């Protein structure tokens, strides 16, 4: 169950982040609302991640710690990306970092979970 919550929350964070970036020029109010909803999903990701950490540590404790750090970095990069967008500063670098870090984090997550819940 926690795997599904974790996966759905990560997908929601990625979708909400991309939507917020695209919608900013049209509506700053909607942008702020999406940013707040994103933060609720951060809490879900952190809680579900805590509940699943014992299974990841059984697989490989070094990779589990690295995945935890990568997850924290993803949240930080999303926050920087959205705050830079709100301040109308260039976001290209953070967008590139966001894509790279998300791909690494997702890959580690599926490796540590043995593909669960998507490939099981």
UniProtKB/Swiss-Prot annotation:
Entry's transmembrane regions: 3-23, 33-53, 62-82, 92-112
HAMAP family tied to this protein: UPF0344
Membrane keyword on record: yes
Keywords, comma-separated and alphabetical: Cell membrane, Membrane, Transmembrane, Transmembrane helix
Subcellular location: Cell membrane
Main localisation: membrane
A GO cellular component entry from the record: plasma membrane
Organism of origin: Listeria monocytogenes serovar 1/2a (strain ATCC BAA-679 / EGD-e)
Pfam families per the UniProt record, alphabetical: DUF1516
Name this polypeptide is given: UPF0344 protein lmo2265
Signal peptide range: none
Family assignment from sequence similarity: Belongs to the UPF0344 family.
Organism domain of life: Bacteria
InterPro entries: UPF0344 (IPR010899)
Its membrane topology: Multi-pass membrane protein
Keyword Transcription recorded: no
